[in-house]
């Protein structure tokens, strides 16, 4: 007895592996994208700091480069360092 597959419709979903569900800077969901991007995914990745807080890449880069942030994490105020 042989089985012949006529059609196959695969469905997949993904989520970021972050403790929070929203970016602490722009307040947009991590499964979406930051205000600067049109589509979520590789062009708008999540970035973790040494303090384990996660943000959209574009959001944290703007935050760290702003004059008022003094390059500190917006959540815990530790000096911002990208997690290796």
Curated annotation (Swiss-Prot):
Q: Where in the cell is it found?
A: Cytoplasm; Nucleus
Q: Which InterPro entries match?
A: RING-box_E3_Ubiquitin_Ligase (IPR051031), RING-H2_APC11 (IPR024991), Znf_RING (IPR001841), Znf_RING/FYVE/PHD (IPR013083)
Keywords (A to Z) from UniProt: Cell cycle, Cell division, Cytoplasm, Metal-binding, Mitosis, Nucleus, Ubl conjugation pathway, Zinc, Zinc-finger
Q: Which GO terms describe its cellular component?
A: anaphase-promoting complex; cytoplasm; nucleus
Which pathway does it take part in?
Answer: Protein modification; protein ubiquitination
GO MF, one term, reads: cullin family protein binding
Q: Which GO terms describe its biological process?
A: anaphase-promoting complex-dependent catabolic process; cell division; positive regulation of mitotic metaphase/anaphase transition; protein ubiquitination; ubiquitin-dependent protein catabolic process
SUPFAM superfamilies associated with the record: RING/U-box
Residue ranges annotated as zinc fingers (RING-type) are 34-77
Summarizing the function annotation, the protein's role is:
Component of the anaphase promoting complex/cyclosome (APC/C), a cell cycle-regulated E3 ubiquitin-protein ligase complex that controls progression through mitosis and the G1 phase of the cell cycle. The APC/C complex controls several key steps in the cell cycle by mediating ubiquitination and subsequent degradation of target proteins such as cyclins. The APC/C complex is required for the female gametophyte development and is involved in several aspect of development by controlling cell division and cell elongation. Involved in the control of endoreduplication.
This protein's assembly is summarised as: Part of the APC/C complex composed of at least 10 subunits. Interacts with APC2.
Homology family: Belongs to the RING-box family.
The protein depicted here goes by the name: Anaphase-promoting complex subunit 11
Identify the species of origin. Arabidopsis thaliana (Mouse-ear cress)
């Amino acid at each position: 007895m042989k089985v012949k597959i006529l059609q196959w419709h695969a469905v997949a979903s993904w989520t970021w592996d972050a403790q929070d569900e929203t970016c602490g800077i722009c307040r947009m969901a991590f499964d979406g994208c930051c205000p600067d991007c049109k589509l979520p995914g590789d062009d708008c990745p999540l970035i973790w700091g040494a303090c384990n807080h996660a943000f959209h890449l574009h959001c944290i880069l703007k935050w760290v480069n702003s004059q008022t942030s003094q390059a500190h994490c917006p959540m815990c105020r530790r000096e911002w360092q990208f997690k290796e």
